[in-house]
Amino acid sequence: MKFNDYVENLQNYEAGKPVELVVREYGVKEDDVIKLASNENPLGTGKKAVKAIYKMAKHANLYPDDSMFELKGALADKYGVSEKNVIIGAGSDQIIEFLIHAKCNENNGILTAGTTFSMYGIYAKHAKAKHFSTASKFHDLKEIKELYESHKDEISVIFLCVPNNPLGECLDAKDVIKFIKSIDDDTLVVIDAAYNEFASFKDKHKHIEPAEIVKLKNAIYLGTFSKVYGLGGLRVGYGVADEKIISALYKLRPPFNVANLSLAAAVAALQDKKFIEKTIKNNFKEMKKYEKFANATGIKFIKSYTNFITFILDESKKSSEISQKLLEKGLIVRDLKGYGLNAIRITVGLPKQNKRIFDELRKLLG
């Protein structure tokens, strides 16, 4: 069967390997497998969210409330915006897909940093759109602006991943706002803030307020419940923007796109302040251990404002080989070879999990 040419040439997103695969292919006992590849919450899911899931489970035969009234209201209250400024998606990446289809075509496209979340480029290809990226792997706003000015007629969406995945660096909020104000009104600036709860805790200057983004008219703030809220398996994300932007995106949203269990869990997760605080504090307490380990062993690392850390390996050690050897031991990390980096990205886990990573890396890199 023949498919459209652009489909034949599309690349698949490389997700972190599941625990089941490691058990099956390498014979590691399930209890010995540690997954630190996908930036999931190592503490699991909060009690309030779990309770909400159990309560909603008896209604699994029913379609969800398509208005998503409760979750939209909870997010609107949290951020001090109107419910008309909020859209809910099956993960924030679904909203990224909506945005690209709403703004891009064969004659224009997106602009990103050199190394950033790969789904931006993949969705651009879905829309047969162009993809401009900076030479710098990091978010250099000066370079991004220069590239935008030189291709202004061909760029309709600019993605800023704040903090950036997979590197972990983070722009200051004031610089992001200043940048957005310098961009033409018809060019949409997307603030992908999947890890912003972590960045805001580490440095208040990194905190981006969605209500400020709403005022700018040409920008949207994206958040997710997959990281600090511990709901990666339920796929819930959201966008906060001017009402006109949200209204346009709703025309692309399929009905019942987020399950009722997911909606109920997300509402409960927003209220679970103790779980959120515990998650963030564990993350940065353990992050210090990763930094100490890297300094002691001579590994270069990127200062991270997220729940992961990226280790840049020496040329004598290949990231693909190191990640494979870790995998054979039941330790799942993310090889960044596909991003053109000799590096591995490791989700910050629990103390015992992190100790195993350190012990194995010492053997492999020593």
From Swiss-Prot:
InterPro entries: Aminotransferase_I/II_large (IPR004839), HisP_aminotrans (IPR005861), HistidinolP_aminotransfase (IPR050106), PyrdxlP-dep_Trfase (IPR015424), PyrdxlP-dep_Trfase_major (IPR015421), PyrdxlP-dep_Trfase_small (IPR015422). Its cofactor is pyridoxal 5'-phosphate. SUPFAM superfamilies: PLP-dependent transferases. GO terms for molecular function: histidinol-phosphate transaminase activity; pyridoxal phosphate binding. The modification N6-(pyridoxal phosphate)lysine is found at residue 227. GO terms for biological process: L-histidine biosynthetic process. The keyword Amino-acid biosynthesis applies. Its EC number is 2.6.1.9. It comes from the Bacteria. Pathway: Amino-acid biosynthesis; L-histidine biosynthesis; L-histidine from 5-phospho-alpha-D-ribose 1-diphosphate: step 7/9. Transmembrane segments: none annotated. It catalyses: L-histidinol phosphate + 2-oxoglutarate = 3-(imidazol-4-yl)-2-oxopropyl phosphate + L-glutamate. It is an enzyme of class 2 (transferase). Keywords: Amino-acid biosynthesis, Aminotransferase, Histidine biosynthesis, Pyridoxal phosphate, Transferase. Pfam families: Aminotran_1_2 (PF00155). Belongs to the class-II pyridoxal-phosphate-dependent aminotransferase family. Histidinol-phosphate aminotransferase subfamily. Homodimer. HAMAP family: HisC_aminotrans_2 (MF_01023). This is Histidinol-phosphate aminotransferase. It comes from Campylobacter hominis (strain ATCC BAA-381 / DSM 21671 / CCUG 45161 / LMG 19568 / NCTC 13146 / CH001A).
